[in-house]
Amino acid sequence: MCSFLRVPSPKGLEPSKGLGAPLQPGTAYPSEMSALGPGMTVSGRKSPLSMEVGLAPEGKDDLEERRVFMGTTSPTELGLRVGLRKDFPCSKTYEERMASPEIRSPSSKGLELRLKRQNISRTVMDGSNLGVHRVSASQETKPPLSALPGRVGLEKERFLAGYCPGRVTQPPLGQGCESPQASGGRRCPVTGDPEGFGASVSKLPALGMECRGELGGESACVVMKPRAETEPPVEVDMGLTRLEEPAEMESPEPQMGLVMEPPAWQLAQQPEEQREAENTEPGVEPPDRIRPIYSGKFFDRMPCWPSAGKVLPIGYRAATCLTERFPRLMTPPEAKKFFNFRYPPAGAERVFYGRANDPQIAPSLTHGIRSKISIPAKVLINPQPITTFQQKMKDKKESVYFSNQRAPLGKSHDQTPGLPKGLDILNTTFGTAIVRETSARDMVNPPKPYKEVFEEAQAGHDLYVVSHNDYFVGEAKNRKYDPSSFHRFNLYGIPTPHFNDGRNMAKTLHWLHELQMKRGAKIVSKRVDDFKEKFQHRLGRVLDPIAETMNVPPDYTFGAFLRPEDYGVGDLIHRRLPGEYLRGKDRQRGLVAAVRHHLKKVNYQNFDTLLAAFRHYDKKGDGVIDRAELQEACDQACLHLDEKLLDQLFEYCDVDKDGLINYLEFANFLTWKDKTPLKEYEERVLIKGRKADCANPAEANVEESEPALLLKPEDIVLKEPGSSEKTLRTLLRPSDKVSNHYKTTSSEISAVVGAVPSTCYPTYGVPTIRSDIPAPLIRRVSDRTSYGEEGNAYSLLHPTIFAQKGVFERDFFKTRSKQEISEILCNIGVKLSEDEFENVWNLASKKHHRGEVCVENIRSVLDELQHADGAKCKAAT
């Protein structure tokens, strides 16, 4: 068991007489103190942490081995203490080196002086064969990682301080540099004044035999009270409980301790370090200042051991690296104007460097005449309301004006002064009463049919033409020329070029340069054109990427050539003859249709009746139109047809193939007969062949009819069933008639008597509308199956009245009570007595096996009752 005591240095103790040699200052570890025998002597003095211990040779050797094992002695020290003697060459070399004045430091010189004085005292007191070993108490310095620049010098001084017979010991690794006894209880450093050291040597006390007996019973390490020293710069917590001590260590009671206080000369800052600290930047710690790695909940038990990894300086952080060390250089004002001219700042005006330093007069100049501030528009548009008194005063001021008296704003002027006295101004009306026969609405849109309005407009038109020159739009003026030499429908002069395809209008819609660009040659890159032809689709053409590799014409078709038939499906259905086939004649039929459409439009716009149009075509007046007359009429209508197209048109209109176009054929193929109904007098002329009635003004302009009949009575039919208007019957070509033996393939299926009906044929696949399975009450979001309860396209285009009102199928089939059904019938206007309603309810409840009634059942019952009542009425009649 090792115990540690700290006792103050007694001043009245005498040196021990039993010692064979003078005790020298030194320290010992607990393990070393326990190895000492009863012959150990400890001497304390005021030198820092000094102890004198007397050891036997055996104990001395044991202590040497313990020192080597514990690692408390440096290799150089071990060589000097154990293996090296005075006659050893290395020892002599080291002594010569240390004796040179260049290597010696002030502290080493002081130590050398002390050692000389101690040697003098040793020779005086040396009188026995007891081996004495001196233990030095020099401590290691604070920085454990050899990071401080003054470490080499300190180790030299430490070595010199212990280069007397004895050795330099260090505290165990992990031991802190500050102990609870070190705060406030330190003295002067060992490297102090040599005179003070001499005084301390003369006052060396000696411990008596009582102390030896105590040491023999239980080894103890007695630590003498050191002088006051400067505190180390950094504290390292050892994790042990610290004992609080007063500021002055004068208590005679011994205290326990595990830490040896280092001397102040080891902790004192060197002048080089002070200069380096002064050169560091403010707010940044120097790189050589090492802090403990662990400063949180864990303790660094071995602060002297180097830590793993790279220890970065604490002061250098990202903010320090990103902060500019030196301020930016400022551009001189003389050069700034040139820089601003070439690279103006964002949002700044580019100013020429020649006038950059000119006085700024333009911003303060104001051009024009300064106008006076008038009333703002806000006050004029929305003035502040005035009081009633102010309004009265304003009206009184304006009442003197004549305009205010005769035409006041918003009301009529006072007419009382100009009226006779006693006149009832409220009930008296001046002027003649207006008879309101017809309203403006009836004048603009009279409540009459179109036919009646048209007849009223035509009545008296011939008289208005003579009296007022009132002609209809597009009506030709009748100049009463001699019809024998002049016909009013003939055309004279040079014909104006006209095209119905709108090419002239297309020219007016484009600028001249656009038309010239269209006529100009379009230059396209051959590479682009080849790429488009090979890879891009074209309208109406099949994409053929390898067309350029084929040495064939563009319209070439590979494979066996199949000659198409002359007839098509339509020719087979209508059973046309070989000369009447329509296949391959689409262009020809299109041209004929275009000519017919143009003639129909001319006849409708220029003639009021079909008879007048037919008379225009019938130049000879024989009641038929031949080929020459048709060509003349086409020329008058600006249709210059070639011989082939004219023959096709004439052949199309001549249904009976007699070489002439009669009135019925003309009305069917060259006019819109449905838009020009047959008039009564026109019917008499066509059927009876009589002359026109001169008393009727509508028939006065009609030329004398031919005695031959133009139509048969059966050719005139009603325009619509039940209508009074009449029109001509529609002609059908023999080729348009469908054969009576024509039957479809679907009609021939199952035509055999006794065959299996088509409903019994097996069906394959899943039906589109799944009416075979019931629809779920709650459908999933992902369920897109049609169960037949949803509406189709017809229901969307033509919704029922129920859908328009928001009533759906589930509302019809929902079970309802008797009171609810009664309210629904009353709301829709169906009034039933109580007996009738009970009868309807009973019939509807019988339709369901559980007696439930819905709106659909009530509706079906009402329909059945109504149908039964109608059948009874028919039977009674």
Curated annotation (Swiss-Prot):
<dbReference type="GO" id="GO:2001256">
    <property type="term" value="P:regulation of store-operated calcium entry"/>
</dbReference>
<feature type="binding site">
    <location>
        <position position="618"/>
    </location>
    <ligand>
        <name>Ca(2+) 1</name>
    </ligand>
</feature>
<feature type="domain" description="EF-hand 1">
    <location>
        <begin position="605"/>
        <end position="640"/>
    </location>
</feature>
<feature type="domain" description="EF-hand 2">
    <location>
        <begin position="641"/>
        <end position="676"/>
    </location>
</feature>
<dbReference type="InterPro" id="IPR018247">
    <property type="entry name" value="EF_Hand_1_Ca_BS"/>
</dbReference>
<keyword id="KW-0106">Calcium</keyword>
<feature type="binding site">
    <location>
        <position position="629"/>
    </location>
    <ligand>
        <name>Ca(2+) 1</name>
    </ligand>
</feature>
<keyword id="KW-0282">Flagellum</keyword>
<feature type="region of interest" description="Disordered">
    <location>
        <begin position="268"/>
        <end position="290"/>
    </location>
</feature>
<dbReference type="GO" id="GO:0006816">
    <property type="term" value="P:calcium ion transport"/>
</dbReference>
<feature type="binding site">
    <location>
        <position position="656"/>
    </location>
    <ligand>
        <name>Ca(2+) 2</name>
    </ligand>
</feature>
<dbReference type="GO" id="GO:0030317">
    <property type="term" value="P:flagellated sperm motility"/>
</dbReference>
<feature type="binding site">
    <location>
        <position position="622"/>
    </location>
    <ligand>
        <name>Ca(2+) 1</name>
    </ligand>
</feature>
<keyword id="KW-0109">Calcium transport</keyword>
<feature type="binding site">
    <location>
        <position position="658"/>
    </location>
    <ligand>
        <name>Ca(2+) 2</name>
    </ligand>
</feature>
<keyword id="KW-0963">Cytoplasm</keyword>
<comment type="function">
    <text>Microtubule inner protein (MIP) part of the dynein-decorated doublet microtubules (DMTs) in cilia axoneme, which is required for motile cilia beating. Cytosolic sensor for calcium, modulates the interaction of STIM1 and ORAI1 upon store depletion and the activation of store-operated Ca(2+) entry (SOCE) and NFAT translocation from cytosol to nucleus.</text>
</comment>
<keyword id="KW-0677">Repeat</keyword>
<dbReference type="GO" id="GO:0005879">
    <property type="term" value="C:axonemal microtubule"/>
</dbReference>
<keyword id="KW-0813">Transport</keyword>
<dbReference type="GO" id="GO:0061891">
    <property type="term" value="F:calcium ion sensor activity"/>
</dbReference>
<dbReference type="GO" id="GO:0160111">
    <property type="term" value="C:axonemal A tubule inner sheath"/>
</dbReference>
<comment type="subunit">
    <text>Microtubule inner protein component of sperm flagellar doublet microtubules. Interacts with STIM1 and ORAI1; the interactions take place upon Ca(2+)-store depletion and dissociate through a Ca(2+)-dependent mechanism. Interaction with STIM1 inhibits STIM1 interaction with SARAF.</text>
</comment>
<dbReference type="Pfam" id="PF25325">
    <property type="entry name" value="EF-hand_EFHB_C"/>
</dbReference>
<keyword id="KW-0406">Ion transport</keyword>
<dbReference type="InterPro" id="IPR040193">
    <property type="entry name" value="EFHC1/EFHC2/EFHB"/>
</dbReference>
<dbReference type="Pfam" id="PF13499">
    <property type="entry name" value="EF-hand_7"/>
</dbReference>
<protein>
    <recommendedName>
        <fullName>EF-hand domain-containing family member B</fullName>
    </recommendedName>
</protein>
<feature type="binding site">
    <location>
        <position position="665"/>
    </location>
    <ligand>
        <name>Ca(2+) 2</name>
    </ligand>
</feature>
<keyword id="KW-0966">Cell projection</keyword>
<keyword id="KW-0969">Cilium</keyword>
<dbReference type="InterPro" id="IPR002048">
    <property type="entry name" value="EF_hand_dom"/>
</dbReference>
<feature type="region of interest" description="Disordered">
    <location>
        <begin position="1"/>
        <end position="47"/>
    </location>
</feature>
<dbReference type="GO" id="GO:0005509">
    <property type="term" value="F:calcium ion binding"/>
</dbReference>
<dbReference type="InterPro" id="IPR011992">
    <property type="entry name" value="EF-hand-dom_pair"/>
</dbReference>
<dbReference type="GO" id="GO:0070884">
    <property type="term" value="P:regulation of calcineurin-NFAT signaling cascade"/>
</dbReference>
<keyword id="KW-0479">Metal-binding</keyword>
<feature type="binding site">
    <location>
        <position position="654"/>
    </location>
    <ligand>
        <name>Ca(2+) 2</name>
    </ligand>
</feature>
<dbReference type="GO" id="GO:0036126">
    <property type="term" value="C:sperm flagellum"/>
</dbReference>
<keyword id="KW-0206">Cytoskeleton</keyword>
